[in-house]
Amino acid sequence: PMVLVMSRFGIALGFGEKNIGEVCRQNGVDACTFLTVVNFLTEEISAPVTNVSNCLSIEALITYLHNAHDYFLNFRLPHLRRKLLEAIAECPQDVAFVIQRFFDEYAEEVNKHMSYEEKVVFPYVRGLLEGKKDPKYNISIFRKRHDQIEMKIIELKNILIKYYPGPGSNLLNSVLFDIFATCLLYTSPSPR
C-alpha cells in the first residue's frame, strides 16, 4: 500500500535516494501523518492509533481521503466493473444482468457515501478544527452510514459465490479478491 499512500498524498515516484522526511518536505506533506497512515495500513492488527495526536495533521488526512476517493471512483471502481463483466460474460444473461446490476448499485452507494464525506464529513471536521461545533451532526451519524456500504459488498460476494454458474472460476476468484482487497480498504471504518 505504500505506493498508493504516496500517490494519495501527492508524492510522485522517482524521488531517488531521499529518505521519507526529505520526500515529504519536498512535496509539502506532513511526515508524521504520512507515516501514521502507512503504518496503520500495513499493520496486521487495525488497533486505534495512539500517541500521535500532537503531530497528526487532520488537513493532510482529509487531502489523503479526498485523493483516495478520486482514485477509487474514477479509476478503481470502473476497472473492477470491467473485470467483473469479463468474468461473468459466459453466465446466463439473466444471472449476468443481476450481478451487474448489483455491482452498479454498490458503486452508486459508494459514490453517494464518498460524496457525503466530501460535502458533509470533511467540512464538519474542518469546522471542529476551527472550534465550530455543529449541534445537528456528530461522527456517530457517519459511522452508521459506513456500515451500510460494508453490508452491500458482502451481499455481492454472497451472490457471486452462491449463484455464479459460469466457467472459468479463476477470473471470478480474481475479481472477488480485487473487490474485497480494494473495497474494504476504502469502505472500512476509519480508526477511532
Question: Which residue ranges define each predicted feature?
Answer:
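Membrane-cytosol interface segments
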Residues: 1-45
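Short, charged/polar, low-complexity loop and linker segments
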Residues: 51-58, 88-99, 167-177
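A general alpha-helix detector
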Residues: 19-22, 60-61, 105, 179-182
